[in-house]
UniProtKB/Swiss-Prot annotation:
Keywords: Cobalamin, Cobalt, DNA synthesis, Nucleotide-binding, Oxidoreductase. Residues 526-553 have a biased composition (Low complexity). Substrate binds at P193, T194, G195, T196, I197. InterPro entries: RdRp_reductase_class-2 (IPR050862), RNR_lg_C (IPR000788), TSCPD_dom (IPR024434). One of its GO terms (molecular function) is ribonucleoside-diphosphate reductase activity, thioredoxin disulfide as acceptor. It comes from Streptantibioticus cattleyicolor (Streptomyces cattleya). SUPFAM superfamilies: PFL-like glycyl radical enzymes. This is Vitamin B12-dependent ribonucleotide reductase. Its cofactor is adenosylcob(III)alamin. Coiled coil: none annotated. Gene3D superfamilies: 3.20.70.20. The gene is nrdJ.
Length: 599
Protein backbone atom coordinates (compact mmCIF):
# COMPACT_ATOMS: atom_id res chain seq x y z
CA UNK A 1 0.00 0.00 0.00
CA UNK A 2 2.58 2.50 -1.19
CA UNK A 3 2.92 3.27 -4.91
CA UNK A 4 1.13 2.09 -8.03
CA UNK A 5 3.09 -0.09 -10.45
CA UNK A 6 5.50 -1.23 -7.79
CA UNK A 7 6.30 -4.45 -5.97
CA UNK A 8 7.29 -5.44 -2.46
CA UNK A 9 9.96 -8.06 -1.83
CA UNK A 10 8.58 -10.26 0.97
CA UNK A 11 10.17 -12.44 3.63
CA UNK A 12 8.87 -13.87 6.90
CA UNK A 13 10.47 -15.21 10.07
CA UNK A 14 9.11 -18.02 12.24
CA UNK A 15 8.81 -16.45 15.69
CA UNK A 16 8.74 -19.80 17.49
CA UNK A 17 12.37 -20.37 16.44
CA UNK A 18 13.39 -17.42 18.64
CA UNK A 19 11.51 -18.57 21.74
CA UNK A 20 14.00 -19.66 24.37
CA UNK A 21 13.24 -22.17 27.14
CA UNK A 22 15.20 -20.99 30.17
CA UNK A 23 14.16 -23.92 32.39
CA UNK A 24 17.39 -25.87 31.95
CA UNK A 25 19.63 -22.84 32.47
CA UNK A 26 18.05 -21.64 35.71
CA UNK A 27 17.46 -25.10 37.18
CA UNK A 28 13.69 -24.65 37.47
CA UNK A 29 11.40 -27.63 37.52
CA UNK A 30 9.56 -28.81 34.42
CA UNK A 31 6.26 -27.29 35.50
CA UNK A 32 5.89 -23.57 34.92
CA UNK A 33 9.12 -23.33 32.93
CA UNK A 34 10.50 -19.88 32.12
CA UNK A 35 10.49 -18.70 28.52
CA UNK A 36 11.92 -15.65 26.82
CA UNK A 37 12.31 -14.27 23.32
CA UNK A 38 15.90 -14.12 22.11
CA UNK A 39 15.77 -10.48 21.02
CA UNK A 40 19.46 -10.29 20.14
CA UNK A 41 19.35 -13.29 17.79
CA UNK A 42 16.07 -12.04 16.32
CA UNK A 43 17.66 -8.66 15.48
CA UNK A 44 20.69 -10.34 13.89
CA UNK A 45 18.47 -12.47 11.63
CA UNK A 46 16.43 -9.39 10.65
CA UNK A 47 19.62 -7.55 9.63
CA UNK A 48 20.79 -10.52 7.57
CA UNK A 49 17.44 -10.97 5.81
CA UNK A 50 17.07 -7.24 5.06
CA UNK A 51 20.52 -7.20 3.47
CA UNK A 52 19.70 -10.21 1.31
CA UNK A 53 16.32 -8.76 0.31
CA UNK A 54 17.86 -5.47 -0.81
CA UNK A 55 20.50 -7.28 -2.87
CA UNK A 56 17.83 -9.41 -4.54
CA UNK A 57 16.15 -6.31 -6.00
CA UNK A 58 19.18 -5.77 -8.22
CA UNK A 59 18.82 -9.23 -9.76
CA UNK A 60 15.06 -9.68 -9.79
CA UNK A 61 12.83 -9.66 -12.86
CA UNK A 62 9.42 -7.97 -12.80
CA UNK A 63 6.18 -8.45 -14.74
CA UNK A 64 6.36 -5.08 -16.52
CA UNK A 65 9.05 -2.52 -17.21
CA UNK A 66 7.17 0.14 -15.22
CA UNK A 67 6.98 -2.07 -12.13
CA UNK A 68 10.71 -2.75 -12.42
CA UNK A 69 11.53 0.97 -12.67
CA UNK A 70 9.41 1.92 -9.65
CA UNK A 71 10.73 -0.95 -7.53
CA UNK A 72 14.37 -0.12 -8.24
CA UNK A 73 13.71 3.58 -7.60
CA UNK A 74 12.13 3.04 -4.15
CA UNK A 75 13.41 -0.44 -3.19
CA UNK A 76 10.45 -1.37 -0.99
CA UNK A 77 11.03 -4.36 1.27
CA UNK A 78 8.47 -6.34 3.24
CA UNK A 79 10.00 -8.31 6.06
CA UNK A 80 7.46 -9.83 8.43
CA UNK A 81 6.86 -12.76 10.72
CA UNK A 82 4.66 -15.81 11.10
CA UNK A 83 3.49 -18.03 13.98
CA UNK A 84 2.54 -15.15 16.30
CA UNK A 85 -0.56 -17.05 17.45
CA UNK A 86 1.52 -20.07 18.41
CA UNK A 87 4.09 -17.86 20.17
CA UNK A 88 1.42 -16.21 22.31
CA UNK A 89 -0.11 -19.58 23.19
CA UNK A 90 3.28 -21.08 24.06
CA UNK A 91 4.07 -18.16 26.37
CA UNK A 92 0.70 -18.43 28.13
CA UNK A 93 -0.85 -15.29 26.61
CA UNK A 94 -4.40 -15.15 25.33
CA UNK A 95 -4.57 -13.72 21.82
CA UNK A 96 -7.17 -11.16 22.87
CA UNK A 97 -5.33 -9.88 25.95
CA UNK A 98 -3.24 -6.87 26.91
CA UNK A 99 -0.21 -9.07 27.47
CA UNK A 100 -0.54 -10.69 24.06
CA UNK A 101 -0.91 -7.35 22.31
CA UNK A 102 2.07 -5.88 24.20
CA UNK A 103 4.31 -8.77 23.15
CA UNK A 104 3.14 -8.55 19.52
CA UNK A 105 3.77 -4.80 19.45
CA UNK A 106 7.24 -5.20 20.96
CA UNK A 107 8.27 -7.83 18.40
CA UNK A 108 6.94 -5.74 15.50
CA UNK A 109 8.67 -2.61 16.75
CA UNK A 110 12.00 -4.42 17.13
CA UNK A 111 11.70 -5.95 13.66
CA UNK A 112 10.93 -2.67 11.87
CA UNK A 113 13.42 -0.63 13.89
CA UNK A 114 16.20 -3.12 13.16
CA UNK A 115 15.22 -3.15 9.47
CA UNK A 116 15.46 0.63 9.09
CA UNK A 117 18.71 0.70 11.05
CA UNK A 118 20.22 -1.77 8.59
CA UNK A 119 18.71 0.25 5.71
CA UNK A 120 20.52 3.36 6.96
CA UNK A 121 23.75 1.37 7.27
CA UNK A 122 23.39 0.13 3.69
CA UNK A 123 22.75 3.69 2.48
CA UNK A 124 26.08 4.73 3.97
CA UNK A 125 27.80 2.21 1.67
CA UNK A 126 25.76 2.16 -1.57
CA UNK A 127 23.63 5.29 -1.25
CA UNK A 128 19.92 5.98 -0.57
CA UNK A 129 17.07 4.94 -2.81
CA UNK A 130 16.58 7.04 -5.93
CA UNK A 131 13.41 8.75 -4.74
CA UNK A 132 14.76 9.69 -1.32
CA UNK A 133 15.75 13.28 -2.18
CA UNK A 134 12.21 14.44 -2.86
CA UNK A 135 10.79 12.38 0.02
CA UNK A 136 13.44 13.00 2.68
CA UNK A 137 11.32 15.12 5.03
CA UNK A 138 8.35 12.78 4.84
CA UNK A 139 10.53 9.71 5.37
CA UNK A 140 12.23 11.14 8.45
CA UNK A 141 8.88 12.26 9.85
CA UNK A 142 7.56 8.69 9.56
CA UNK A 143 10.65 7.40 11.38
CA UNK A 144 9.99 9.82 14.25
CA UNK A 145 6.37 8.65 14.41
CA UNK A 146 7.50 5.02 14.67
CA UNK A 147 9.92 5.93 17.45
CA UNK A 148 7.26 7.91 19.34
CA UNK A 149 4.85 4.97 19.13
CA UNK A 150 7.55 2.72 20.56
CA UNK A 151 8.11 5.09 23.47
CA UNK A 152 4.39 5.34 24.22
CA UNK A 153 3.77 1.60 24.09
CA UNK A 154 2.65 -0.17 27.26
CA UNK A 155 5.03 -2.63 28.92
CA UNK A 156 3.25 -5.55 30.55
CA UNK A 157 5.56 -8.26 31.91
CA UNK A 158 9.06 -9.67 32.01
CA UNK A 159 8.64 -11.34 28.64
CA UNK A 160 8.01 -8.25 26.53
CA UNK A 161 10.08 -5.73 28.51
CA UNK A 162 13.50 -6.86 27.13
CA UNK A 163 12.09 -6.78 23.63
CA UNK A 164 10.82 -3.22 24.12
CA UNK A 165 14.27 -2.22 25.39
CA UNK A 166 15.96 -3.64 22.28
CA UNK A 167 13.38 -1.92 20.08
CA UNK A 168 13.95 1.44 21.79
CA UNK A 169 17.68 1.17 21.16
CA UNK A 170 17.06 0.28 17.52
CA UNK A 171 14.81 3.31 16.95
CA UNK A 172 17.34 5.66 18.52
CA UNK A 173 19.92 4.34 16.06
CA UNK A 174 17.44 4.76 13.20
CA UNK A 175 16.94 8.46 13.92
CA UNK A 176 20.67 9.07 14.28
CA UNK A 177 21.91 7.03 11.32
CA UNK A 178 19.05 8.13 9.09
CA UNK A 179 19.97 11.76 9.59
CA UNK A 180 23.58 11.00 8.66
CA UNK A 181 23.33 8.34 5.96
CA UNK A 182 19.74 8.59 4.72
CA UNK A 183 17.88 5.33 3.93
CA UNK A 184 18.33 2.63 1.33
CA UNK A 185 14.67 1.52 1.31
CA UNK A 186 11.40 3.46 1.19
CA UNK A 187 9.61 0.69 3.10
CA UNK A 188 10.92 -2.10 5.27
CA UNK A 189 8.15 -4.17 6.83
CA UNK A 190 4.68 -5.59 6.31
CA UNK A 191 2.80 -8.54 7.75
CA UNK A 192 2.04 -10.96 4.91
CA UNK A 193 -0.47 -13.84 5.16
CA UNK A 194 2.19 -16.62 4.81
CA UNK A 195 -0.60 -19.08 4.03
CA UNK A 196 1.19 -21.86 2.17
CA UNK A 197 4.81 -21.06 3.07
CA UNK A 198 3.80 -21.15 6.74
CA UNK A 199 3.31 -24.92 6.49
CA UNK A 200 6.77 -25.33 4.95
CA UNK A 201 8.24 -23.11 7.70
CA UNK A 202 6.89 -25.48 10.37
CA UNK A 203 4.37 -22.90 11.58
CA UNK A 204 1.21 -23.72 13.51
CA UNK A 205 -0.28 -20.31 12.67
CA UNK A 206 0.13 -17.92 9.74
CA UNK A 207 1.24 -14.30 9.84
CA UNK A 208 -0.32 -12.36 12.69
CA UNK A 209 -3.29 -14.74 12.81
CA UNK A 210 -4.36 -16.79 15.80
CA UNK A 211 -4.76 -20.49 15.24
CA UNK A 212 -7.88 -21.28 13.23
CA UNK A 213 -8.68 -24.20 15.52
CA UNK A 214 -6.72 -26.55 17.75
CA UNK A 215 -7.60 -29.35 15.31
CA UNK A 216 -8.27 -28.34 11.71
CA UNK A 217 -8.52 -29.82 8.24
CA UNK A 218 -6.77 -28.41 5.17
CA UNK A 219 -8.40 -29.02 1.79
CA UNK A 220 -5.87 -30.34 -0.72
CA UNK A 221 -5.72 -29.22 -4.34
CA UNK A 222 -5.83 -32.78 -5.66
CA UNK A 223 -8.84 -33.67 -3.51
CA UNK A 224 -9.26 -34.89 0.04
CA UNK A 225 -8.04 -33.19 3.21
CA UNK A 226 -5.29 -33.47 5.80
CA UNK A 227 -5.68 -33.12 9.56
CA UNK A 228 -3.51 -30.47 11.23
CA UNK A 229 -3.11 -30.56 15.03
CA UNK A 230 -1.62 -27.64 16.96
CA UNK A 231 1.74 -28.72 18.38
CA UNK A 232 2.04 -25.70 20.69
CA UNK A 233 -0.50 -26.87 23.25
CA UNK A 234 1.98 -28.97 25.32
CA UNK A 235 4.37 -26.00 25.59
CA UNK A 236 1.54 -23.72 26.68
CA UNK A 237 0.38 -26.19 29.33
CA UNK A 238 3.93 -26.53 30.60
CA UNK A 239 4.26 -22.73 30.76
CA UNK A 240 1.01 -22.58 32.76
CA UNK A 241 2.39 -25.05 35.33
CA UNK A 242 0.72 -28.35 34.45
CA UNK A 243 2.40 -31.68 35.12
CA UNK A 244 3.33 -34.05 32.24
CA UNK A 245 0.47 -36.47 32.97
CA UNK A 246 -2.00 -33.57 33.01
CA UNK A 247 -0.59 -32.34 29.70
CA UNK A 248 -1.14 -35.76 28.12
CA UNK A 249 -4.74 -35.87 29.33
CA UNK A 250 -5.53 -32.41 27.95
CA UNK A 251 -3.89 -33.17 24.59
CA UNK A 252 -5.90 -36.40 24.30
CA UNK A 253 -9.10 -34.48 25.05
CA UNK A 254 -8.28 -31.91 22.33
CA UNK A 255 -7.56 -34.63 19.78
CA UNK A 256 -10.95 -36.18 20.49
CA UNK A 257 -13.16 -33.10 20.91
CA UNK A 258 -11.22 -30.34 19.08
CA UNK A 259 -11.36 -27.91 22.04
CA UNK A 260 -10.29 -27.56 25.68
CA UNK A 261 -13.74 -27.21 27.21
CA UNK A 262 -14.11 -29.65 30.12
CA UNK A 263 -10.60 -30.98 29.54
CA UNK A 264 -9.52 -33.01 32.61
CA UNK A 265 -7.45 -30.96 35.02
CA UNK A 266 -7.51 -27.73 32.98
CA UNK A 267 -8.50 -24.64 34.94
CA UNK A 268 -11.30 -22.54 33.39
CA UNK A 269 -9.23 -19.36 33.76
CA UNK A 270 -6.73 -20.87 31.31
CA UNK A 271 -9.31 -21.57 28.60
CA UNK A 272 -8.67 -18.18 26.96
CA UNK A 273 -5.04 -19.09 26.22
CA UNK A 274 -6.33 -21.71 23.77
CA UNK A 275 -8.98 -19.54 22.11
CA UNK A 276 -8.91 -19.75 18.31
CA UNK A 277 -10.41 -17.96 15.33
CA UNK A 278 -13.20 -20.54 15.04
CA UNK A 279 -14.80 -23.16 17.21
CA UNK A 280 -16.48 -23.39 20.59
CA UNK A 281 -14.32 -20.61 22.08
CA UNK A 282 -13.84 -18.26 19.14
CA UNK A 283 -11.99 -14.97 19.49
CA UNK A 284 -14.35 -12.02 19.07
CA UNK A 285 -14.00 -10.01 15.83
CA UNK A 286 -12.83 -6.96 17.78
CA UNK A 287 -10.11 -9.13 19.32
CA UNK A 288 -8.63 -9.51 15.84
CA UNK A 289 -8.91 -5.78 15.18
CA UNK A 290 -7.24 -4.84 18.48
CA UNK A 291 -4.30 -7.17 17.75
CA UNK A 292 -3.83 -5.54 14.35
CA UNK A 293 -3.95 -2.11 15.99
CA UNK A 294 -1.17 -3.18 18.37
CA UNK A 295 1.19 -3.98 15.47
CA UNK A 296 0.19 -1.33 12.90
CA UNK A 297 2.11 1.66 14.40
CA UNK A 298 5.38 -0.20 13.88
CA UNK A 299 4.89 -1.32 10.26
CA UNK A 300 5.81 0.44 7.03
CA UNK A 301 2.98 -1.16 5.12
CA UNK A 302 -0.29 -2.80 6.03
CA UNK A 303 -1.34 -6.08 7.62
CA UNK A 304 -2.77 -8.91 5.57
CA UNK A 305 -5.06 -10.52 8.09
CA UNK A 306 -8.53 -11.99 8.18
CA UNK A 307 -11.05 -10.85 10.75
CA UNK A 308 -13.10 -14.00 11.20
CA UNK A 309 -16.80 -13.50 11.76
CA UNK A 310 -19.50 -16.11 12.35
CA UNK A 311 -21.94 -17.13 9.67
CA UNK A 312 -24.67 -15.29 11.56
CA UNK A 313 -22.88 -11.90 11.30
CA UNK A 314 -25.10 -9.04 10.13
CA UNK A 315 -24.33 -6.13 7.83
CA UNK A 316 -24.39 -3.77 10.80
CA UNK A 317 -21.83 -5.85 12.69
CA UNK A 318 -19.48 -5.88 9.70
CA UNK A 319 -19.91 -2.12 9.31
CA UNK A 320 -18.98 -1.64 12.96
CA UNK A 321 -15.79 -3.69 12.51
CA UNK A 322 -14.64 -1.50 9.61
CA UNK A 323 -15.47 1.66 11.54
CA UNK A 324 -13.52 0.55 14.60
CA UNK A 325 -10.56 -0.46 12.41
CA UNK A 326 -10.51 3.01 10.88
CA UNK A 327 -10.59 4.65 14.31
CA UNK A 328 -7.68 2.48 15.49
CA UNK A 329 -5.55 3.54 12.52
CA UNK A 330 -5.46 0.35 10.46
CA UNK A 331 -4.33 0.69 6.86
CA UNK A 332 -6.26 -2.35 5.65
CA UNK A 333 -8.91 -4.71 6.96
CA UNK A 334 -10.40 -7.91 5.51
CA UNK A 335 -13.56 -9.63 6.72
CA UNK A 336 -14.21 -13.35 6.30
CA UNK A 337 -17.67 -14.59 7.16
CA UNK A 338 -17.64 -18.30 7.89
CA UNK A 339 -19.04 -20.50 5.11
CA UNK A 340 -19.39 -17.55 2.73
CA UNK A 341 -17.62 -19.67 0.11
CA UNK A 342 -18.47 -23.07 -1.28
CA UNK A 343 -14.97 -24.27 -0.45
CA UNK A 344 -12.48 -22.73 1.98
CA UNK A 345 -8.87 -23.98 2.36
CA UNK A 346 -9.03 -24.40 6.14
CA UNK A 347 -11.97 -25.47 8.27
CA UNK A 348 -12.42 -26.35 11.90
CA UNK A 349 -14.16 -29.62 11.12
CA UNK A 350 -14.96 -31.91 8.29
CA UNK A 351 -18.24 -31.39 6.53
CA UNK A 352 -20.86 -33.01 8.68
CA UNK A 353 -23.22 -35.45 7.13
CA UNK A 354 -26.88 -34.58 7.28
CA UNK A 355 -28.38 -35.76 10.53
CA UNK A 356 -31.82 -36.21 9.09
CA UNK A 357 -33.13 -39.70 8.90
CA UNK A 358 -32.42 -41.50 5.67
CA UNK A 359 -35.49 -41.57 3.44
CA UNK A 360 -37.17 -44.88 2.97
CA UNK A 361 -35.77 -46.78 0.04
CA UNK A 362 -38.02 -46.42 -2.96
CA UNK A 363 -38.54 -49.48 -5.06
CA UNK A 364 -37.52 -49.00 -8.65
CA UNK A 365 -40.63 -49.04 -10.79
CA UNK A 366 -39.21 -48.38 -14.25
CA UNK A 367 -35.62 -48.61 -15.33
CA UNK A 368 -35.05 -47.94 -19.01
CA UNK A 369 -32.03 -49.24 -20.82
CA UNK A 370 -31.77 -48.85 -24.58
CA UNK A 371 -31.96 -52.18 -26.37
CA UNK A 372 -30.75 -52.70 -29.88
CA UNK A 373 -33.45 -54.00 -32.21
CA UNK A 374 -31.69 -55.82 -35.00
CA UNK A 375 -33.20 -56.27 -38.44
CA UNK A 376 -34.21 -59.74 -39.61
CA UNK A 377 -32.08 -61.65 -42.10
CA UNK A 378 -34.52 -60.88 -44.86
CA UNK A 379 -35.49 -57.24 -44.87
CA UNK A 380 -37.30 -54.92 -47.27
CA UNK A 381 -35.22 -52.13 -48.72
CA UNK A 382 -35.05 -49.31 -51.24
CA UNK A 383 -31.99 -48.44 -53.29
CA UNK A 384 -31.94 -44.89 -54.66
CA UNK A 385 -29.45 -43.52 -57.15
CA UNK A 386 -28.81 -39.80 -56.95
CA UNK A 387 -26.69 -36.99 -58.31
CA UNK A 388 -25.80 -33.93 -56.23
CA UNK A 389 -23.80 -31.18 -57.90
CA UNK A 390 -22.44 -33.67 -60.43
CA UNK A 391 -21.43 -36.26 -57.81
CA UNK A 392 -23.16 -39.61 -58.28
CA UNK A 393 -24.03 -42.03 -55.51
CA UNK A 394 -26.30 -44.78 -54.28
CA UNK A 395 -28.26 -45.06 -51.05
CA UNK A 396 -29.76 -48.29 -49.75
CA UNK A 397 -32.32 -47.92 -46.97
CA UNK A 398 -33.50 -51.12 -45.31
CA UNK A 399 -36.47 -51.20 -42.96
CA UNK A 400 -38.17 -53.43 -40.45
CA UNK A 401 -41.19 -55.46 -41.52
CA UNK A 402 -43.33 -52.83 -39.81
CA UNK A 403 -41.86 -50.20 -42.17
CA UNK A 404 -39.60 -48.50 -39.64
CA UNK A 405 -36.19 -47.51 -41.06
CA UNK A 406 -33.42 -49.69 -39.62
CA UNK A 407 -30.21 -49.13 -41.57
CA UNK A 408 -28.66 -47.01 -44.31
CA UNK A 409 -25.78 -47.74 -46.71
CA UNK A 410 -24.09 -45.12 -48.87
CA UNK A 411 -21.86 -45.62 -51.88
CA UNK A 412 -20.32 -42.81 -53.91
CA UNK A 413 -19.05 -43.33 -57.44
CA UNK A 414 -15.39 -42.61 -58.23
CA UNK A 415 -14.64 -42.45 -54.52
CA UNK A 416 -11.24 -42.87 -52.95
CA UNK A 417 -10.46 -44.99 -49.93
CA UNK A 418 -10.80 -42.05 -47.52
CA UNK A 419 -14.27 -41.02 -48.70
CA UNK A 420 -15.38 -44.67 -48.83
CA UNK A 421 -14.26 -45.20 -45.25
CA UNK A 422 -15.97 -42.03 -44.04
CA UNK A 423 -19.22 -42.98 -45.78
CA UNK A 424 -19.11 -46.49 -44.32
CA UNK A 425 -18.44 -45.14 -40.82
CA UNK A 426 -21.22 -42.56 -41.17
CA UNK A 427 -23.66 -45.22 -42.37
CA UNK A 428 -22.82 -47.55 -39.49
CA UNK A 429 -23.21 -44.76 -36.92
CA UNK A 430 -26.64 -43.77 -38.25
CA UNK A 431 -27.77 -47.39 -38.58
CA UNK A 432 -26.76 -48.32 -35.03
CA UNK A 433 -28.52 -45.22 -33.71
CA UNK A 434 -31.71 -46.13 -35.55
CA UNK A 435 -31.60 -49.68 -34.18
CA UNK A 436 -31.19 -48.33 -30.63
CA UNK A 437 -34.31 -46.20 -31.02
CA UNK A 438 -33.04 -42.78 -32.14
CA UNK A 439 -35.96 -41.31 -34.13
CA UNK A 440 -35.37 -40.69 -37.81
CA UNK A 441 -36.78 -37.16 -37.43
CA UNK A 442 -33.93 -36.38 -35.01
CA UNK A 443 -31.37 -37.23 -37.67
CA UNK A 444 -33.33 -35.29 -40.28
CA UNK A 445 -33.51 -32.15 -38.13
CA UNK A 446 -29.78 -32.32 -37.37
CA UNK A 447 -28.38 -33.10 -40.83
CA UNK A 448 -30.64 -31.23 -43.25
CA UNK A 449 -29.41 -27.82 -44.42
CA UNK A 450 -25.77 -28.76 -43.74
CA UNK A 451 -23.82 -26.95 -46.42
CA UNK A 452 -20.60 -28.19 -48.01
CA UNK A 453 -19.41 -29.35 -51.43
CA UNK A 454 -20.55 -31.09 -53.55
CA UNK A 455 -23.83 -29.16 -53.57
CA UNK A 456 -26.32 -27.89 -56.12
CA UNK A 457 -28.81 -29.43 -58.52
CA UNK A 458 -29.93 -33.03 -58.12
CA UNK A 459 -31.68 -35.47 -60.45
CA UNK A 460 -34.44 -36.09 -57.90
CA UNK A 461 -37.71 -34.27 -58.81
CA UNK A 462 -38.72 -34.18 -55.13
CA UNK A 463 -35.43 -32.60 -53.98
CA UNK A 464 -34.29 -30.30 -56.77
CA UNK A 465 -31.59 -28.52 -54.76
CA UNK A 466 -29.33 -29.90 -52.04
CA UNK A 467 -26.79 -27.99 -50.01
CA UNK A 468 -24.69 -31.14 -49.54
CA UNK A 469 -24.86 -34.89 -50.00
CA UNK A 470 -25.88 -35.29 -46.36
CA UNK A 471 -28.63 -32.71 -46.85
CA UNK A 472 -29.99 -34.67 -49.82
CA UNK A 473 -29.78 -38.08 -48.11
CA UNK A 474 -31.85 -37.11 -45.11
CA UNK A 475 -34.39 -35.17 -47.17
CA UNK A 476 -34.86 -38.30 -49.28
CA UNK A 477 -35.15 -40.50 -46.18
CA UNK A 478 -37.70 -38.11 -44.69
CA UNK A 479 -39.80 -38.26 -47.85
CA UNK A 480 -39.63 -42.07 -47.92
CA UNK A 481 -40.13 -42.93 -44.25
CA UNK A 482 -41.61 -40.02 -42.28
CA UNK A 483 -45.34 -39.22 -42.16
CA UNK A 484 -46.55 -36.03 -43.80
CA UNK A 485 -47.13 -34.14 -40.54
CA UNK A 486 -43.62 -34.82 -39.23
CA UNK A 487 -41.69 -33.91 -42.36
CA UNK A 488 -43.96 -30.95 -43.08
CA UNK A 489 -43.00 -29.51 -39.71
CA UNK A 490 -39.39 -29.87 -40.86
CA UNK A 491 -40.14 -28.08 -44.15
CA UNK A 492 -39.68 -31.14 -46.39
CA UNK A 493 -42.25 -31.72 -49.15
CA UNK A 494 -42.44 -33.71 -52.33
CA UNK A 495 -42.79 -32.15 -55.79
CA UNK A 496 -46.48 -33.08 -55.85
CA UNK A 497 -47.09 -31.39 -52.51
CA UNK A 498 -45.27 -28.24 -53.59
CA UNK A 499 -47.40 -28.09 -56.73
CA UNK A 500 -50.54 -28.54 -54.65
CA UNK A 501 -49.39 -25.64 -52.49
CA UNK A 502 -49.11 -23.43 -55.56
CA UNK A 503 -52.60 -24.45 -56.72
CA UNK A 504 -54.55 -24.56 -53.45
CA UNK A 505 -52.34 -22.80 -50.91
CA UNK A 506 -51.91 -25.96 -48.85
CA UNK A 507 -49.42 -28.81 -48.84
CA UNK A 508 -51.95 -31.23 -47.35
CA UNK A 509 -53.47 -33.86 -49.65
CA UNK A 510 -57.13 -33.30 -50.63
CA UNK A 511 -59.70 -35.22 -48.58
CA UNK A 512 -62.14 -37.53 -50.39
CA UNK A 513 -65.36 -35.79 -49.44
CA UNK A 514 -67.46 -37.37 -52.20
CA UNK A 515 -67.92 -41.01 -53.16
CA UNK A 516 -66.59 -42.38 -56.41
CA UNK A 517 -69.91 -42.17 -58.26
CA UNK A 518 -70.47 -38.63 -57.13
CA UNK A 519 -67.00 -37.68 -58.34
CA UNK A 520 -67.80 -39.02 -61.79
CA UNK A 521 -71.00 -36.97 -62.15
CA UNK A 522 -70.51 -33.87 -60.03
CA UNK A 523 -69.23 -30.48 -60.98
CA UNK A 524 -65.98 -29.13 -59.47
CA UNK A 525 -66.06 -29.04 -55.68
CA UNK A 526 -67.24 -25.86 -53.96
CA UNK A 527 -66.06 -24.33 -50.73
CA UNK A 528 -69.37 -25.13 -48.94
CA UNK A 529 -71.16 -28.48 -48.54
CA UNK A 530 -72.62 -30.10 -51.68
CA UNK A 531 -76.16 -29.81 -50.43
CA UNK A 532 -75.85 -26.08 -49.95
CA UNK A 533 -74.51 -25.70 -53.49
CA UNK A 534 -77.58 -27.34 -55.08
CA UNK A 535 -80.20 -25.47 -53.05
CA UNK A 536 -78.75 -21.98 -53.31
CA UNK A 537 -81.17 -19.41 -54.89
CA UNK A 538 -80.58 -18.39 -58.48
CA UNK A 539 -80.28 -14.76 -57.46
CA UNK A 540 -77.01 -15.44 -55.69
CA UNK A 541 -75.44 -16.46 -58.97
CA UNK A 542 -75.50 -12.79 -60.03
CA UNK A 543 -73.78 -11.55 -56.84
CA UNK A 544 -70.10 -10.68 -57.12
CA UNK A 545 -67.72 -13.48 -56.24
CA UNK A 546 -66.69 -13.52 -52.60
CA UNK A 547 -63.10 -12.60 -51.82
CA UNK A 548 -60.91 -15.65 -51.35
CA UNK A 549 -60.47 -16.60 -47.72
CA UNK A 550 -57.08 -15.80 -46.26
CA UNK A 551 -54.54 -18.56 -46.39
CA UNK A 552 -54.51 -20.63 -43.24
CA UNK A 553 -51.45 -22.34 -41.76
CA UNK A 554 -51.82 -25.99 -40.86
CA UNK A 555 -48.36 -26.39 -39.32
CA UNK A 556 -45.39 -24.36 -38.13
CA UNK A 557 -43.66 -24.46 -41.51
CA UNK A 558 -46.65 -23.01 -43.36
CA UNK A 559 -47.07 -20.36 -40.64
CA UNK A 560 -43.44 -19.31 -41.11
CA UNK A 561 -43.92 -19.10 -44.86
CA UNK A 562 -47.08 -16.97 -44.48
CA UNK A 563 -45.34 -14.56 -42.10
CA UNK A 564 -42.09 -14.22 -44.06
CA UNK A 565 -43.37 -14.76 -47.60
CA UNK A 566 -40.55 -17.26 -48.07
CA UNK A 567 -40.23 -21.02 -48.17
CA UNK A 568 -38.96 -22.28 -44.84
CA UNK A 569 -36.73 -24.84 -46.54
CA UNK A 570 -35.42 -22.47 -49.23
CA UNK A 571 -31.61 -22.50 -49.54
CA UNK A 572 -29.30 -19.52 -49.18
CA UNK A 573 -28.00 -17.81 -52.30
CA UNK A 574 -24.64 -19.18 -53.45
CA UNK A 575 -23.54 -15.65 -54.43
CA UNK A 576 -24.69 -13.31 -51.66
CA UNK A 577 -26.12 -15.55 -48.94
CA UNK A 578 -29.66 -14.12 -49.05
CA UNK A 579 -32.61 -16.45 -48.49
CA UNK A 580 -33.91 -17.47 -51.92
CA UNK A 581 -37.55 -17.57 -53.08
CA UNK A 582 -39.17 -20.45 -54.90
CA UNK A 583 -39.82 -19.86 -58.60
CA UNK A 584 -41.49 -22.90 -60.10
CA UNK A 585 -39.46 -25.93 -59.15
CA UNK A 586 -36.28 -23.90 -58.52
CA UNK A 587 -35.22 -20.85 -56.51
CA UNK A 588 -34.31 -17.26 -57.34
CA UNK A 589 -32.42 -14.73 -55.18
CA UNK A 590 -34.14 -11.36 -54.81
CA UNK A 591 -30.91 -9.81 -53.57
CA UNK A 592 -28.58 -10.33 -56.51
CA UNK A 593 -30.79 -12.04 -59.11
CA UNK A 594 -28.93 -15.35 -59.09
CA UNK A 595 -30.94 -18.50 -59.75
CA UNK A 596 -30.55 -22.11 -58.79
CA UNK A 597 -30.11 -23.00 -62.43
CA UNK A 598 -33.53 -23.48 -63.99
CA UNK A 599 -35.68 -20.40 -63.22
Amino acid sequence: MHLDNSSCNLASLNLMKFLRDDTASDGASGAGGNMSLDAERFAKVVELVITAMDISICFADFPTEKIGETTRAFRQLGIGYANLGALLMATGHAYDSDGGRALAGAITSLMTGTSYRRSAELAAVVGPYEGYARNADAHKRVMRQHADANTAAQRMDDLDTPVWAAATEAWQDVLRLGEQNRFRNAQASVLAPTGTIGLMMDCDTTGVEPDLALVKFKKLVGGGSMQIVNNTVPKALKRLGYQPEQVEAVVAHIAEHGNVIDAPGLKPEHYEVFDCAMGERAISPMGHVRMMAAAQPFLSGAISKTVNMPESATVEEIEEIYYEGWKLGLKALAIYRDNCKVGQPLSAKKKEEAKTEAPAEVEKVVEYRPVRKRLPKGRPGITTSFTVGGAEGYMTANSYPDDGLGEVFLKMSKQGSTLAGMMDAFSIAVSVGLQYGVPLETYVSKFTNMRFEPAGLTDDPDVRMAQSIVDYIFRRLALDFLPFETRSALGIHSAEERQRHLDTGSYEPAEDELDVEGLAQSAPRQAGPAKAATTAPAAKAQEPAAAPSPKQAHNSTELLEIQQGLNADAPLCFSCGTKMRRAGSCYVCEGCGSTSGCS
